[in-house]
């Protein structure tokens, strides 16, 4: 079972919105740094960068936005969290599923960092990706339909392929 959620990474909003913002989850650079936090991943093999350098991911993403004239856009990137039921997957399996989710959902068009964190009872992936395609400068679409048919649908399909449980509509989903 993989529980997924997606968070839009935006630039700083007005101070009146600061209450609802969590800077650790909304700034692109901080999200990349958080995903690659060595204290949470324990081993380098649980970090993968797609279409960018692992150590230069933020710089690569910012350069893509500049190259396509999109650096002033509100949406900087996205942070997907994919959490698994405790004991259902190994760290290697969780990471492989996260990388495959990124490949299938984003079609090789965006810079992506996938990091599997082992710091909780439930293993979870952080998939942080640029809102701007490095291939053509197009922005990632982020409607509810795109989420349910795209990211969540692909995550569910991967879980089914691996023989893992899948959250059905209406079930209590969040892992403890």
What do the predicted segments below correspond to?
Residues 1-176:
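N-terminal nicking endonuclease/strand-transfer module with a His-rich metal-binding environment
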């Amino acid at each position: 079972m993989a529980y997924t959620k997606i968070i839009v990474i935006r630039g700083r909003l007005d101070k009146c919105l600061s209450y609802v913002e969590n800077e650790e989850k909304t700034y692109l650079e901080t999200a990349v740094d958080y995903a690659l936090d060595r204290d949470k991943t324990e081993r380098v093999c649980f970090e993968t960068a797609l279409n960018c350098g692992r150590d230069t991911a933020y710089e690569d993403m910012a350069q893509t936005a500049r190259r396509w004239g999109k650096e002033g856009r509100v949406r900087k990137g996205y942070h997907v969290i994919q959490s698994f039921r405790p004991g259902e997957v190994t760290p290697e399996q969780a990471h492989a599923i996260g990388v495959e989710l990124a490949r299938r959902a984003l079609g090789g068009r965006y810079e992506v960092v996938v990091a599997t964190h082992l710091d909780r009872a439930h293993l979870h992936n952080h998939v942080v990706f640029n809102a701007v395609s490095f291939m053509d400068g197009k922005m990632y679409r982020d409607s509810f339909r795109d989420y349910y048919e795209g990211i969540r649908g692909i995550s569910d399909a991967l879980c089914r392929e691996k023989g893992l449980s899948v959250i059905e509509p209406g079930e209590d989903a969040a892992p403890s």
